[in-house]
């Protein structure tokens, strides 16, 4: 019998379908959130009742939702926080909970560098002016003239 997986996170597999291919290769039937927004409790209860696993976004997995999940063995939370999962209740029901604390690390670092460069070169201001039909040169500051520090 095929294992079933509910994916609440949105979007999932749209930019890169590698995770979906891996699930198919593992013969895991999956359901991707069809609502393009967080599930309500009622929607979660409907979808979670017959699944073995959940890849969860930030949807609230409450006691009521977990109680309706009769076959659930594992919740894998995308991202760094677990505050959307009632951990004590999950444990009492024998549901394992995992998460990806370092998952967004590289993306956050890359985005930070992007914002630094955009700020230094005033690209955002230039874009706004151009959208308003104004061609104005924003020179900004070059990296070679700067000392850049990142805290955090």
Language-model region placement:
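Glycine-rich NAD(P)-binding loop of Rossmann-like domains
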Residues: 126-152
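Phosphate/diphosphate ligand-binding glycine-rich loop within oxidoreductases
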Residues: 51-127, 141
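Short, flexible, glycine/charge-rich loop motifs used to bind or transfer phosphoryl groups or to couple energy/partner
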Residues: 19-21, 43-45, 62-65, 87, ...
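N-terminal glycine-/charge-rich "phosphate-binding" loop or analogous flexible N-terminal tail
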Residues: 1-51
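Short gly/ser/thr-rich secondary-structure transition/capping motifs
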Residues: 34-39, 56-57, 128-136
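Phosphate-coordination loops involved in phosphoryl transfer and adenosine-cofactor binding
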Residues: 2, 72, 144-147
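Structural detector of well-ordered beta-strand residues that form the stable sheet scaffold
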Residues: 6, 31, 74-76, 96-98, ...
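Small/polar loops that bind or transfer phosphate-bearing groups
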Residues: 7, 32, 57-58, 100-101, ...
């Amino acid at each position: 019998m095929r294992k079933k997986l509910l994916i609440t996170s949105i979007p999932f597999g749209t930019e890169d379908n590698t995770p979906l291919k891996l699930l198919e290769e593992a013969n895991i039937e999956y359901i991707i959130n069809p609502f393009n927004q967080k599930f309500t409790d009622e929607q979660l209860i409907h979808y979670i009742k017959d699944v073995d696993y959940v890849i969860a976004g930030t949807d609230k997995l409450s006691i009521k939702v977990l109680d309706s999940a009769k076959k659930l063995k594992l919740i894998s939370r995308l991202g760094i926080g677990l505050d959307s999962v009632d951990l004590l209740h999950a444990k009492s029901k024998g549901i394992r909970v995992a998460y990806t604390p370092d998952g967004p690390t590289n993306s956050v670092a890359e985005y930070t560098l992007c914002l630094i460069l955009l700020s230094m070169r005033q690209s955002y201001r230039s874009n706004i002016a151009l959208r308003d039909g104004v061609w104005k040169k924003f020179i900004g500051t070059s990296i070679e003239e700067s000392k850049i520090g990142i805290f955090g």
